[in-house]
Amino acid sequence: MAEKNERAIKVVAENRKARFNYAIEDTVEAGIALTGTEVKSVRNGKTTIAESYADSKNGEIWLINANIPEYLQANRFNHEPKRPRKLLLHRKQINKLLGAVDREGMTLIPLKLYFNERGRAKLLLAVAKGKKLHDKRESEKKRDWGREKGRLLRARG
């Protein structure tokens, strides 16, 4: 039997500070509308989503401040690196996300930008609430204690 050519999910950019700075309530996978040169640049892996966030305009959700650098081999048809990019979601998903943002003071932050099995660019979007300084310290203490516990158990045998 011939094996099926299966592609793995390729993570291109990850917002590693998001889990430290925000308490994440829910995540949603969203498509992202990119131009041709943006797709090629994202595949090169130079994308940054650390300072970006999602916001609504005219009932749609847009990714703001994500840095996708210009594609070097492109000529005059290149894209603007920090332009707002439309996120592709169903209407029910948009209403749910905007409701959480309006009612509960949540914010929408990207966690990962990746290509799925079909080669489509996807964004893992989180509904999150910002942590205060003492919350960050508390989560850091919990993480350190978990590491220390693991070390003690391994040393004990």
From Swiss-Prot:
One of the Pfam families matching this protein, by short name: SmpB
InterPro entries named among the record's database cross-references: SmpB (IPR023620), SsrA-bd_prot (IPR000037), SsrA-bd_prot_CS (IPR020081)
Keywords in UniProt for this one?
Answer: Cytoplasm, RNA-binding
Where is this chain's protein located in or outside the cell?
A: Cytoplasm
Q: Per the UniProt entry, what is one GO biological process?
A: trans-translation
Q: Which domain of life is it from?
A: Bacteria
Q: What does this protein do?
A: Required for rescue of stalled ribosomes mediated by trans-translation. Binds to transfer-messenger RNA (tmRNA), required for stable association of tmRNA with ribosomes. tmRNA and SmpB together mimic tRNA shape, replacing the anticodon stem-loop with SmpB. tmRNA is encoded by the ssrA gene; the 2 termini fold to resemble tRNA(Ala) and it encodes a 'tag peptide', a short internal open reading frame. During trans-translation Ala-aminoacylated tmRNA acts like a tRNA, entering the A-site of stalled ribosomes, displacing the stalled mRNA.
In Swiss-Prot or TrEMBL terms, this protein is called SsrA-binding protein
